Amino acid sequence: MNPTTPRGGQLWSRCGGCASLLYRKRLRRNLDVCPECGAHSRLDAPARLAQLVDPGSFTALADRAPEVDPIGFVDVLPYPHRLTAARSGTGLAEAVVCGTATVAGSRCVIAVMDFRFLGGSLGCAVGELITQAAERALADRVPLVVVTASGGARMQEGVLSLMQMATVSQAVAALRESGVPSVSVLTDPTYGGVAASFATNTDVVIAESGARMGFAGPRVIRQVTGRELPDGFQTAEFLLRHGQVDLVVPRHALRGCLATLLAAASGGREPVGAGHESECPPVDGSSTQERGADKRDAWETVRLARHPGRPTTLDYLETAFDSFVELHGDRLGADCPAVVGGLAELAGRPVLVVGHQKGHTTGDLMSRNFGMASPAGHRKALRLARLAARWGLPVVTLVDTPGADPGVGAEEQGQAAAIAENILTLTMLPTPVVAVITGEGGSGGALALAVADRVLMLEHAVYSVISPEGCAAILWPDRSAAPQAARALRLTSADLCRLGVVDAVVPEPAPAAHHDPPAAMQAVREAVLAHLVPLLEVPTATLVRRRRRRFRRFGAAGLGARAGAR
């Protein structure tokens, strides 16, 4: 149970998490987070604004919500009397405060709910105020930030309170349609109609540490099911494990996290190509192809591509990119560990990166399912690609997988459909896409992240319709014939450059990437920049048309023309 911020005049407060007696000034200095157990006290709207926005930047929006008592509700008190008491007790007109502000210099419209006001319940006035905030964000083309704290719909307004879920959601939909970013911050508690609408249908969902969120509250669930609930049920950490939120952030880091997201959303950094020419060397297709055409045996290349010392996607994100904020979850119940992705910065430009994650040790590999994505992993990648399209961010994918997860569970959850939807979406994504095969490119699991404007490949990576072992077992049939199958499959970077599947080969430090990971990661950084920069200048319609034409040439007619040209 989360503790409540102490009332004015109290010198001491008892933590609701660990029962420690805390000096109030010390608690305030620690942002109302218990220094003993880390429990986060609830904050009122003014305190939350003071924590999140730049000092002096907040300007309240005009309160144009009319006084409403739509159904003349009376319980032990008439509804208007409850409103009067809530206003007197909080000093607020309603359960939400809306205005314009900046966060680390990035402009936004922000709406902060206050649980003290009738449990932060969603009624007609609250719905109207948040809708007006979204409309202001749309008019100004600045991100909308919503900080939620609510028990759900306001019962005293009957079914009209239910309608606010749709009213605010369609305002969020208008932001999506126009490419205006939206971010929600879930604080404790967020339930019912708020959880099932604007708290979770924004572009990015952040949960403050320990915050609880759900459609039905725990008491209702216990009553209906007659079962005890697991420890940590509906907490932020539970939601993260189950793919419902992008991030769980402690209060002291919340402002910085929000600032990073808003900067990426607004693209408020120096564009690549202006002041970064030294990191964008021209690409000589013939020389890169020639470099990839080494004499190493195909089977030896397969073994190098699988070496556990090769840089992983998280290694690249730490070294080849300037910053990275990981975004989690497919929003449908899972967060696949074999796929990682999020917002990164590359030479001053916000980009979205998504890739397969393996690991360097047996434990890492097992925890990441050896880089074999489940349907949840593919759907996470799909969600992030669509986010990039809405925010106008280029996409970089890093491919290193033996293939998609072939398990029974994956088939039950729609593996084929998940891969198919990724391929379909990437063919028409209205933003530049650069794919890099960094290790293994295994079958449809690889292609699900490799439908791109430019496909690059590390010198000792492989890309194939099937593993050599699988091919040998089916066609020879003898798994020991895997080396022969590797040669026959034409899966090396040199082979794929000649076939036109790969646009350029990224040289590896001798003898291979795992001998000098920093050099390999720097080479990938330079190659991605070299291929991404020209794409940023291509109009969207032309970009998509060229991407489709690129893959159309792999039809029989296109391959026949290539053979004739040779």
Swiss-Prot record:
EC number: 2.1.3.15
Disulfide bond sites: none
InterPro entries the record matches: AcCoA_carboxyl_beta, Acetyl_CoA_COase_a_su, Acetyl_CoA_COase_Trfase_b_su, ClpP/crotonase-like_dom_sf, COA_CT_C, COA_CT_N, Znf-ACC
Ranges where the record places region Carboxyltransferase: 11-534
Region called Disordered, residue ranges: 268-295
Presence of keyword Zinc: yes
GO terms for MF: acetyl-CoA carboxylase activity; ATP binding; carboxyl- or carbamoyltransferase activity; zinc ion binding
GO BP term, example: malonyl-CoA biosynthetic process
Region (Acetyl-coenzyme A carboxylase carboxyl transferase subunit beta): 1-243
Domain CoA carboxyltransferase C-terminal: residue ranges: 282-534
Chief place where the protein resides: cytoplasm
UniProt-annotated stretches for the region Acetyl-coenzyme A carboxylase carboxyl transferase subunit alpha: 244-557
Entry GO CC: acetyl-CoA carboxylase complex
Needed co-factor(s): Zn(2+)
Enzyme type, top EC level: transferase
Reactions mediated catalytically: N(6)-carboxybiotinyl-L-lysyl-[protein] + acetyl-CoA = N(6)-biotinyl-L-lysyl-[protein] + malonyl-CoA
Cofactor binding remark: Binds 1 zinc ion per subunit.
Gene3D superfamilies named in the record: 2-enoyl-CoA Hydratase, Chain A, domain 1 (3.90.226.10)
Protein localization: Cytoplasm
Residues annotated as binding Zn(2+): C15, C18, C34, C37
Annotated function: Component of the acetyl coenzyme A carboxylase (ACC) complex. Biotin carboxylase (BC) catalyzes the carboxylation of biotin on its carrier protein (BCCP) and then the CO(2) group is transferred by the transcarboxylase to acetyl-CoA to form malonyl-CoA.
Subunit-structure text: Acetyl-CoA carboxylase is a heterotetramer composed of biotin carboxyl carrier protein (AccB), biotin carboxylase (AccC) and two subunits of ACCase subunit beta/alpha.
PANTHER family per record: ACETYL-COENZYME A CARBOXYLASE CARBOXYL TRANSFERASE SUBUNIT ALPHA (PTHR42853), ACETYL-COENZYME A CARBOXYLASE CARBOXYL TRANSFERASE SUBUNIT ALPHA, CHLOROPLASTIC (PTHR42853:SF3)
Descriptive protein name: Acetyl-coenzyme A carboxylase carboxyl transferase subunits beta/alpha
Organism: Salinispora tropica (strain ATCC BAA-916 / DSM 44818 / JCM 13857 / NBRC 105044 / CNB-440)
Gene designation per UniProt: accD
